[in-house]
Amino acid sequence: MSKSLKKKSHWTSKVHESVIGRNPEGQLGFELKGGAENGQFPYLGEVKPGKVAYESGSKLVSEELLLEVNETPVAGLTIRDVLAVIKHCKDPLRLKCVKQGGIVDKDLRHYLNLRFQKGSVDHELQQIIRDNLYLRTVPCTTRPHKEGEVPGVDYIFITVEEFMELEKSGALLESGTYEDNYYGTPKPPAEPAPLLNVTDQILPGATPSAEGKRKRNKSVTNMEKASIEPPEEEEEERPVVNGNGVVITPESSEHEDKSAGASGETPSQPYPAPVYSQPEELKDQMDDTKPTKPEENEDSDPLPDNWEMAYTEKGEVYFIDHNTKTTSWLDPRLAKKAKPPEECKENELPYGWEKIDDPIYGTYYVDHINRRTQFENPVLEAKRKLQQHNMPHTELGAKPLQAPGFREKPLFTRDASQLKGTFLSTTLKKSNMGFGFTIIGGDEPDEFLQVKSVIPDGPAAQDGKMETGDVIVYINEVCVLGHTHADVVKLFQSVPIGQSVNLVLCRGYPLPFDPEDPANSMVPPLAIMERPPPVMVNGRHNYETYLEYISRTSQSVPDITDRPPHSLHSMPADGQLDGTYPPPVHDDNVSMASSGATQAELMTLTIVKGAQGFGFTIADSPTGQRVKQILDIQGCPGLCEGDLIVEINQQNVQNLSHTEVVDILKDCPVGSETSLIIHRGGFFSPWKTPKPMMDRWENQGSPQTSLSAPAVPQNLPFPPALHRSSFPDSTEAFDPRKPDPYELYEKSRAIYESRQQVPPRTSFRMDSSGPDYKELDVHLRRMESGFGFRILGGDEPGQPILIGAVIAMGSADRDGRLHPGDELVYVDGIPVAGKTHRYVIDLMHHAARNGQVNLTVRRKVLCGGEPCPENGRSPGSVSTHHSSPRSDYATYSNSNHAAPSSNASPPEGFASHSLQTSDVVIHRKENEGFGFVIISSLNRPESGATITVPHKIGRIIDGSPADRCAKLKVGDRILAVNGQSIINMPHADIVKLIKDAGLSVTLRIIPQEELNSPTSAPSSEKQSPMAQQHSPLAQQSPLAQPSPATPNSPVAQPAPPQPLQLQGHENSYRSEVKARQDVKPDIRQPPFTDYRQPPLDYRQPPGGDYSQPPPLDYRQHSPDTRQYPLSDYRQPQDFDYFTVDMEKGAKGFGFSIRGGREYKMDLYVLRLAEDGPAIRNGRMRVGDQIIEINGESTRDMTHARAIELIKSGGRRVRLLLKRGTGQVPEYGMVPSSLSMCMKSDKHGSPYFYLLGHPKDTTNPTPGVLPLPPPQACRK
């Protein structure tokens, strides 16, 4: 990347010279504009046609910057002085000009505030501009003047308030700080003061160092000559922004010396104009100007090994780490000198922080290391916390067994009249900083939302009423007692800047724990690493596959009885006063289901300490040091809040004090791996503990009545704890650092089904380390066309990532090792098994920027002479894309299903019906798919002829080859593909058969008309939902299907015992034939972040609502999981298309939608209202994609049109949905015109409905924020 940046031409290559003379009228024929008095370069105004007397060179162009007149630099001069230089010069005039663009435009302030390497052309030009400025202006400073200095000559001495006024008014061209004082360079006046009238001294050849020109700090220089020994004096006397000293701007971390020698004197050698074509010559000329002491300048320190410093097109410095092939804005040399925030001065920022002045959001701060933003100055925040830490605590009389820093939880109530304390009301107006306070709480259903801190100078601080600990009772007459943290955040976010909100607060409740208590020490957050270290589970690093992880960890959980006696002295957690203990609460605990609720787990984690620490905080507890808060989720893989720390680097710390554990963690070297053994679950329950698992599974249709029920096999791969995120009272649902429950269920179900006692279709083992697989590493270099292969799969969580077509003559094709159908396991060492397609594409984009990629793929080998089944496909998963005429599976054969036959006869099941069959041939082009969707209903008993013809056409894509041939209809049953019977063939094999067909496929079908009888099933688009009986035991995997030689069809086989009956949707598979584009990543981007345009991931302002508390920076607060029915996640998932018919209830259809063409996204189900028709129907889920509404396709449909269609259907609505992942995609940027309304359920938990633009709104609902007019909450 750095090479490509260096090849970009510098602006100096566009500098051109024009040689002109005066015309017969004695004029030059062009107008001069700009000038330093206007904060601009001098530039050409109107160039009068025919009035310029050219002698040689290029022609003058209006708006170009004027750099030199007869080799005299004029940048930084006023227009008056530039004209004086021109007037003094004799004909011909040699003018050097350059076109505006890139880093050079007419704005002097912008150019002076950029950072350049010493000796570069830009650095020299900055010097010239500054020296020219000081001919006409005197720098200002807030420091007291020293003996011998003349006010108005050496400096203009002003107060801080006056300096801030100058800065705010735009009167300063440069500003910065040095030694706690502000320095600035004011714009020069258009007409010079008599003291500085040196027009006659600006002659060709004169330089800023020549005799007669005003020198900066002449009196200071003369005084220092006798005492230049002390480096402190030398450092102190070096000016800051006057051209001879140090400039530290908010964008600069370098101490740049501005052509001053060690003595502080201005060098006496001539100061030439920059040589624009040969910048390297200037490096020799600047040797004498470098400081004599390396520690005075970071530039003199060598970069670490294999690091490189480079410049963007705008001249900004960034650093390249060739070891990891990453880039960073942060100077690695400064990391060694980094100070903690509390030790920084108030006018400096800690290492890795940046101050942003945004015209919309105001001033905020960016932490580049932890990738977060906040409004409060980090130095002031750290000092404030330190001051509060040092204050004497008077509330230490806690209960004997209470952990230090944690207070007794107050009695919660949803009734405002039962609150004990003083009520007060206030009205706050939202500013660019938000409301100016942070909140805490709402992580559990019965927890108050309280004010955590009031941001200085924010609206709340200026109002003066709000205090830390105040309970938020009402927001605009809406009672929020019992609302979740995320819900209240959304309420505040919905308030536009400039509008006010009415708050009712209750004072008298302390915070649930003291966040400033010294016992809750913070181990600072970890610097973001490109590849987080793998979790060590039960003493082992990364497992080869998820299957291996499940199978191994399910048998290796230690029993609590193995712990030493002294570690068992633990009191029951809150809500567990009866002495019972909850089960482990983290997804990483994959203990056997029969192990009971008192199982505990020891885990070994490996965490790398970053420049800012580990990224978690610890707090004292009766049993030892516990993890109080995870500040950096990525940096602490596998760690969970409430974990008890047992060992650190093989040193037992259970009996050590809080301070001793903190010291051990501090002593761990930065960048090294630290091994932690933590204890989770069992008697060592954290202070915030969910309800017992059995309580949560009651009345939810649980597949078992007890956690230790003998009916559940011991090799059940998914313990109930894995489904924690769907529990109504869970506080950590959809936590990004934990596996997605939907994904876990899919994989677990596949394992469960594969272990049933049914003859397997093949004999390969589930452990991927067996001989039926081989893994190989493939290293590819990127060509102009990309890496030369396509990626398939990953369209739903849990689907394998597969190599699709290998492009002819591409990088992968030339390498020869990559085959279609290979399962992708690692990309540059990062595991991708079970990841989404988008995630893998992002990794490939990143690899493309580096120009190379290391892939690890897994390939099935022949098993005992028989072809292996399709590569890497988990049972029950569906290949949803045909992307290429080339085969996706190179080693597969269909011979184990049915013998190929060119004349496949109808099966026995429908011969008596005398149904007419026909062959349909579909041809497609190279760049398109066949355009039809197949529904397979192998597991659903049907009547009549369809009992033995389970596959049918479910959908035909408009304009596709299937549509153009006009011979296929929705509902047609498919007997054979290319002459091969598919009646008993699993769905995934049919998909592969069609993929291998090339550019044409022949389908033998029974037309839908032949099936239109009372005994036949309706077409897929007109079926109403059917109640089915499903369970993991009842639903057979394709692995368990009998071979076609079996006389009976799969549906005729007796089903295993069914301990559970769940209402679900059709158990069918569907696959759509369409194209997948090749991966062609863009490598033209420079570093990952752009100072001018902060990316959305972490550089956005902290939020337009109010200043978010640190917990929001680090912890992903979960949505209210009560709206996600538990049964949804236990039903067999098929990621299918399906139809939902609903009757309108008293309050509407009971669902809300997100998306639309105006938001550049598809339409999705956003919320399901409790007890509404949608949730009672049981088929619709949050995150489902809406394909059709009342028969109309939603492709390119606006949000408003979708609302209109739903309303126009009257009392009924029919939706064609595609099963989603349970999570709704976010908007790229939520438009401010979205309207919101809120409805509280009986628990007080609000449901938000994003319904579209205000033009669709109806009358406002009482009790709702009076912001944009709210839409009706009914569909």
Curated annotation (Swiss-Prot):
Record-linked SUPFAM superfamilies: P-loop containing nucleoside triphosphate hydrolases (SSF52540), PDZ domain-like (SSF50156), WW domain (SSF51045)
Region (Interaction with DDN), start-end ranges: 301-380
CDD domains: PDZ0_MAGI-1_3-like, PDZ1_MAGI-1_3-like, PDZ2_MAGI-1_3-like, PDZ3_MAGI-1_3-like, PDZ4_MAGI-1_3-like, PDZ5_MAGI-1_3-like, WW
UniProt-listed GO biological process terms: cellular response to nerve growth factor stimulus; clathrin-dependent endocytosis; negative regulation of activin receptor signaling pathway; negative regulation of cell migration; negative regulation of cell population proliferation; negative regulation of phosphatidylinositol 3-kinase/protein kinase B signal transduction; nerve growth factor signaling pathway; neuroligin clustering involved in postsynaptic membrane assembly
PDZ domain mapped to chain residues: 17-101, 425-509, 604-682, 777-859, 919-1009, 1139-1221
Domain WW residue range list: 301-334, 347-380
Phosphotyrosine PTM positions: 361, 826
Membrane topology: Peripheral membrane protein
Listed Low complexity bias regions: 893-907
Chain intervals with Basic and acidic residues compositional bias: 280-295, 1067-1083
GO molecular function: activin receptor binding; beta-1 adrenergic receptor binding; phosphatase binding; signaling receptor complex adaptor activity; SMAD binding; type II activin receptor binding
Sites bearing Phosphoserine, chain numbering: 685, 883-884, 1013
Function comment: Seems to act as a scaffold molecule at synaptic junctions by assembling neurotransmitter receptors and cell adhesion proteins. Plays a role in nerve growth factor (NGF)-induced recruitment of RAPGEF2 to late endosomes and neurite outgrowth. May play a role in regulating activin-mediated signaling in neuronal cells. Enhances the ability of PTEN to suppress AKT1 activation. Plays a role in receptor-mediated clathrin-dependent endocytosis which is required for ciliogenesis.
Subunit structure: Interacts (via its WW domains) with DRPLA. Interacts (via its second PDZ domain) with PTEN (via unphosphorylated C-terminus); this interaction diminishes the degradation rate of PTEN. Interacts (via guanylate kinase domain) with DLGAP1. Interacts (via the PDZ domains) with GRIN2A, GRID2 and NLGN1. Interacts with CTNND2, CTNNB1 and MAGUIN-1. Interacts with ACVR2A, SMAD2 and SMAD3. Part of a complex consisting of MAGI2/ARIP1, ACVR2A, ACVR1B and SMAD3. May interact with HTR2A. Interacts with RAPGEF2. Identified in a complex with ACTN4, CASK, IQGAP1, NPHS1, SPTAN1 and SPTBN1. Interacts with DDN.
Protein name: Membrane-associated guanylate kinase, WW and PDZ domain-containing protein 2
Species annotation: Mus musculus
Gene: Magi2
